[in-house]
UniProtKB/Swiss-Prot annotation:
Name of the protein this chain belongs to: 3-octaprenyl-4-hydroxybenzoate carboxy-lyase
HAMAP family associated with the record: UbiD
Active site residues of this protein: D287 (proton donor)
Organism: Shewanella pealeana (strain ATCC 700345 / ANG-SQ1)
A biological process term (GO) from this entry: ubiquinone biosynthetic process
Alphabetic keyword roster: Cell membrane, Decarboxylase, Flavoprotein, FMN, Lyase, Manganese, Membrane, Metal-binding, Ubiquinone biosynthesis
Gene this protein is translated from: ubiD
Recorded family membership: Belongs to the UbiD family.
Length: 493
């Protein structure tokens, strides 16, 4: 099942008990965050605040607050089904020619999906039903959340920032938070390695001193939103990838002020430009780490046009100590990464990014070990293969008999199969998340790899322990007589 716009997804969630309408007045200043946070931690529904204090525009929150709703947005019921998305991405990153007629037939579904890649341009799009320019442009009239007490100002959080570099054929979609600075001003907080910042850098080099056109879409259809947070190949537009996932071409329209294309069914569109000479101090803001981040200088986005649907809905979120909505997205997208990594490293059994580790700062990988030093090879590969893992500080590698998603198993492996000196890899002066204040230098720090696998000859001279495992026949016999023993609540093994 695919959703043409955000509203059809909202209706689907409500029909299935996954969305709650809140008619009681709720203030976007702090109150929405507290309510959304409590509901998310209780694994509750998406929330539609119909009566935000000081505004008549409804606010949608917690849309992707559970992995199940992320899967539902892609027309699936089980987050594990998102591995199909990973299989598609693995194919797109490194397509292989068919090995014969039968293999060619098996690849037909993927080639058929590829036909849905080019976006479809439409006229009279819903996102331009209402047009505001000049003095009508007033960002303060949007119900922008002020998430935490220490935040310096309200913050646009779920905007899809649309850019295009002079050397690129495709447009880039990225999600960068934007601090409200004034009636027509936002601070565009994109880090140097992100697609929007790279496009802007290329533009400045080719067109020094000129204004850079930028568009921000709020409330796009759910597949396009998720396409913007998925590791799409660099040469592919997120619009094209969204078309693949949806099974239908992404509908776009031309922005009114520039040649950029925007999702046609979006709720709200902000059009404008960045002057390369206009910068502003951004922050502090509460972030997904659970701390307020440092302030820094970023470009100012000047909004010249606001267009929106009639009766528009404002899509918002908050970030804080996990679990938060980005952490839940991370849990779901974890399943996307597994097939991509397996294509490069078939020995990988499973891969886990614990949400409490800020969804990317720690990874646990289980492998089918085949030779001495194998765990270290996998560590190095994981750090370097995907850009998403360049900021992962800790990697633990375990054997296939260890459930890498069960901390009881992982801690057991670390404490029984590791020597701290022999089995720890330390690498200094590597890229680190800018928000990681624990690193000695902003953006530069160390990484630790832990080999918690059984050691082979060449890795140890000692006789290695054999795990204790009960005889399977005995277990089956005890299963058969358990009800006769009078012991309640048999543990699940």
């Amino acid at each position: 099942m695919s959703f043409k716009d955000l509203r059809s997804f909202i209706d689907h969630l409500e029909t299935n008990g996954e969305l709650k309408r809140i008619s009681h007045p709720v203030d976007p200043h702090l109150e929405m965050t507290e309510i959304a946070d409590r509901v998310l931690r209780a694994k509750g529904p998406a929330l539609l605040f119909e009566n935000p204090v000081g505004n008549d525009m409804p606010v949608l929150a917690n849309l992707f607050g559970t992995p199940k709703r992320v899967a539902m947005a892609l027309g699936k019921e089980d987050p594990l089904a998102l591995r199909d998305v990973g299989e598609l991405l693995a194919f797109l990153k490194e397509p292989e020619p068919p090995r014969g007629f039968k293999d060619a037939i098996s690849k037909i579904p993927m080639f058929k999906q590829a036909l849905n890649m080019p976006p479809k341009t439409v006229r009279n799009p819903p996102c331009q039903q209402v047009v505001k320019t000049g003095d009508e442009v007033d960002l303060t009239k949007l119900p922008i959340q002020h998430c935490w007490p220490g935040d310096v100002a309200p913050l646009v959080t779920w905007g899809l920032t649309i850019t295009k570099g002079p050397r690129q054929k495709r447009q880039n979609l990225g999600i960068y938070r934007q601090q409200l600075l004034g009636r027509d001003k936002l601070i565009m907080r994109w880090l140097d390695h992100r697609g929007g910042a790279l496009d802007f850098k290329d533009f400045k080099e080719k067109h020094p001193g000129e204004r850079y056109p930028v568009v921000v879409a709020l409330g796009a259809d759910p597949v396009t939103i998720l396409g913007a947070v998925t590791p799409v190949p660099d040469a592919m537009s997120e619009y094209a990838f969204a078309g693949l996932l949806r099974g239908e071409r992404t509908e776009v329209c031309k922005a009114l002020s520039c040649d950029l294309e925007v999702p046609a069914t979006s709720e709200i569109i902000l059009e404008g430009y960045i002057d390369p000479d206009e910068m502003a101090e951004e922050g502090p803001y509460g972030d997904h780490t659970g701390y307020y981040n440092e302030t820094d200088s970023f470009p100012v986005f000047t909004v010249t046009h606001i267009t929106h649907r009639k009766d528009a809905i404002y899509h918002s979120t908050y970030t804080g100590r996990p679990p938060d909505e980005p952490a839940m997205l991370g849990v779901a997208l974890n399943e996307v990464f597994v097939p991509i990594l397996r294509k490069q490293y078939p020995e990988i059994i499973d891969f886990y990014l614990p949400p409490e580790g800020c969804s990317y700062r720690m990874a646990v990988i289980s492998i089918r070990k085949q030779y001495p030093g194998h765990a270290k090879r996998v560590m190095m590969g994981a750090w370097s293969f995907l850009r998403q893992f360049m900021y992962t500080k800790f990697i633990v590698v375990v054997d296939e008999d260890v459930n890498c998603r069960d901390w009881n198993d992982v801690i057991w492996a670390i404490t029984t199969r590791m020597d701290p000196k022999r089995d720890t890899v330390m690498i200094e002066n590597t890229p680190i998340d800018y928000l990681d204040f624990a690193s000695p230098v902003a953006g530069l720090g160390s990484k630790m790899g832990m080999d918690a696998t059984n050691k082979w000859e060449g890795e140890t001279d000692r006789e290695w322990g054999t795990p204790i495992v009960m005889d399977e026949a005995v277990k089956q016999k005890v299963d058969a007589i358990w009800d006769d023993l009078g012991i309640d609540d048999a543990p699940t093994l």
